[in-house]
């Protein structure tokens, strides 16, 4: 009798998953990872992405072991290793002289943490997620689907799209980024706040560079820093440069920046760094303002929940923004599997993820101050990888 009761409860959980309609708003890394994790767990998922087409845009991304551990668990290991670069180390250097101040050794991270430290083109990760999702749940990704608003109702949520279409779901997961319209409507009306940092990015064909410049390095000082590293099997070198600004009024993530103005901004850097940033593919450099939001104590309202940058945006200096969204995806999936109702699952998700995401957000801000401060060894104390890399969202305790 005991076995029969236990079996009945288990089957009820399975049926609940199969019958629960989950809508994910946003087809970025966080949304797609969530979709893949949830479809593999047996949930019925639809991803609504506003873009009519997803293309090979964007630049590089760092995936530390806490992120790759989740992605490998989801079966993406071969896809990532086909294009990613595993750097042996990253050197932190004086902006003007190029002298090495600190080395972060990454070549042994797979052995130490049980998962690798990877650098890759953002599109390569996104494409791998799209491909795997299509294999697991054909038709789950709906492009050209711009959600105007969500309205929680009696046990379901209604989604209204820009074209007037209506859909309903049992759960809505907002993975629509720092400018999340769902967060604006249901959680916190305050707009994103400019943090005082502006970033530029570009890609360089490594065939156009001397071999000794094709490396992972961070040059910093003079209120600026430039991070560069190889992606796409070493065929491209990605760079991201950051400087202080008092204000920012432009809109968008892909604002073309005049190359001469960009080079003038970083003219005080060492010759090797200047050579790298002077040779972007097709002379293209893009800029954007770095924004933040006040910390949000509650990430859910009824059957609507926030994930990734929509919940806890962070500055890029820790290299953990995408990793935290990936962790969110796995933890939220586990919570929905374990709890009887979405509301209970969201409360457990908040208790599990809130403290860790808050710590990462705070540390990212502190590292920004260090990286754009004085270039010395003291400014890099605490940069050694720690508990954040050892974290395992696949098996960590919930709650």
Task: Report residues per predicted region.
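Conserved mid-domain beta->alpha element of the FAD-binding
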Residues: 23, 27-52, 173-174, 200, ...
